[in-house]
Amino acid sequence: MNSLLYPKLFGEAGSHFAAEVERRARGSFTIEVQDRMVLDQDSFGALEAGLIDAVWGSAGHHHREDPALAIFSGFPFGPDPDGFTAWMREGGGAEALDAIYARHGLKSLYCGVLPAEGGGWFRAPVETVADLDGLAMRAFGYGALTLRALGVVPYELPAADIRPALDTGLIAAAEFSLPSIDADLGLHEAAGYLYLPGWQQPATSLELLMPERSWAALSDDHRSAIEAACEATLSWSLAMARERQVAALERFRAEGVMVHDWPEEILAALRRAWTEVIAEEAARDALLAAAWESYLGHVESQGSATAQDYID
């Protein structure tokens, strides 16, 4: 299994999943985890060619091969981990994702979820929408498209390149992942202003991805072991991430990092921009449009338990 998730917690979740599979299959089925044997953009081809058997990652990693997948990694002003899991498990999210992966002959299983990312690390305070205009910032996916609408110049940099880019002044801000994972990269040492919440990704999903033919070829017992391991890893990943999140924020404050809430003016502008971005993206792809309608329908069915409840 090729793991695309370099930062510690992401990779640990993949190893935890593999160990759970072996335990539940009583040693009759094992998964060997390899770190980034194949890069994100090469995963589909490597799976098709049989160079790798499976991928551990998040659907958004494959946005270059299918932009519609980005929404399944978590999206701006979306649900928290509980809400995202409810959509994926019971609200039609898994079926919408299956439809997108089916056009590539792939099968995905929802195996983990992490809490909100940080909203971004900045070298100077951000107080108004005007402060974002022309700002060079590491950003990813739909968050990057939304920021671009407000004048930000987004750079999609891999984890190892973010700190050097801040140090050299190539970028003046960065959003990457959970604060606990950002700490491992030393982002707080290069940009001392952290803004919360992570509006761009209130939840991050983790998945197992393999060819449909490989999933079909597994025995019922081995499929059951994998599904049970996914359930176990889902609980483990969220609990572990939340514990580390609290510790990381306490550490940042002790080290003098300025932790700020986003100004309401900026959040309101970002929300408006996101509404326009997702409308434009959905208009280009019928399956993405169906996925978005699935999510909106799920939110409506939940009454007051909306995405806004989490951000606000």
Which residues does each predicted region cover?
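A short acidic, glycine-rich active-site loop
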Residues: 82-92
